[in-house]
UniProtKB/Swiss-Prot annotation:
Transmembrane segments: none annotated. SUPFAM superfamilies: Translation proteins. Disulfide bonds: none annotated. It holds the Pfam family Ribosomal_L3. This is Large ribosomal subunit protein uL3. HAMAP family: Ribosomal_uL3_B (MF_01325_B).
């Protein structure tokens, strides 16, 4: 059964494995989530489930969302995300999804919004080398050559240049689940995941480990 859950990034810490080695982990508060809606191939053209996470007061929702939750008989949730799962038909509306669907040793893909860095140059944004710092150099951290002169007499689209960095949807693949704490709804995965503290994350089965 394919699995997926929503969670919040708590922060990073470290644990020790059986050999006594330090393992850096990210602590995620995963679930409990509720299936708010089911989408089927016959009705919607594809199979998926809509999952809600974190309770919220009904007064903080607009009318369309209030009606959406009332229609399916589910308590209002702050976050709604759609998960395309191969066996979405096995889930039922109102079903609770908890963190214990995962177990230590499994591999997961974690999706989040990366930290926004603002407007950055090519050295920080793209990892380019700086120019010479002495001997009459005319530039140090500039882009350098941006293309030919007479022909084509323009800069091609896609050229790596300064601009806004971060704040984009990023997925980190094939992270190992180190520990699962069902009592506190905590999931510990090896390594780092995108996003600030308390940012929303989507945790799914890894596509590479299948």
């Amino acid at each position: 059964m394919t699995k997926g859950i929503l969670g919040k990034k708590i922060g990073m810490t470290q644990v020790f494995d059986e050999a006594g080695k330090v393992v850096p982990v990210t602590v995620i508060e995963a679930g409990p989530c509720v299936v708010v809606q089911k989408k089927t191939v016959e009705k919607d053209g594809y199979a998926a489930i809509q999952v809600g996470f974190e309770d919220i007061k009904e007064t903080k929702l607009n009318k369309p969302l209030r009606g959406h939750f009332a229609k399916h008989g589910v308590k209002p949730k702050r976050y709604l995300r759609e998960l395309r799962l191969k066996d979405a038909d096995k889930y039922e509306v109102g079903q609770e999804i908890r963190v214990d669907i995962f177990s230590p040793g499994e591999r997961v893909d974690v999706t989040g919004i990366s930290k926004a860095k603002g407007f950055q140059g090519v050295i920080k944004r793209h990892g380019q080398q700086r120019g010479p710092m002495s001997h009459g150099s005319m530039y140090h951290r500039r882009v350098g050559s941006m293309g030919s002169n007479t022909f084509p007499a323009r800069t091609f689209p896609g050229k790596k240049m300064p601009g806004r960095m971060g704040g984009q949807r990023v997925t980190v693949l094939n992270l190992q689940v180190v520990k699962v704490d069902p009592e506190r709804n905590l999931l510990l995965v090896k390594g780092s995941v995108p996003g600030n503290k308390n940012s929303l994350l989507i945790i799914r089965d890894s596509v590479k480990s299948k």
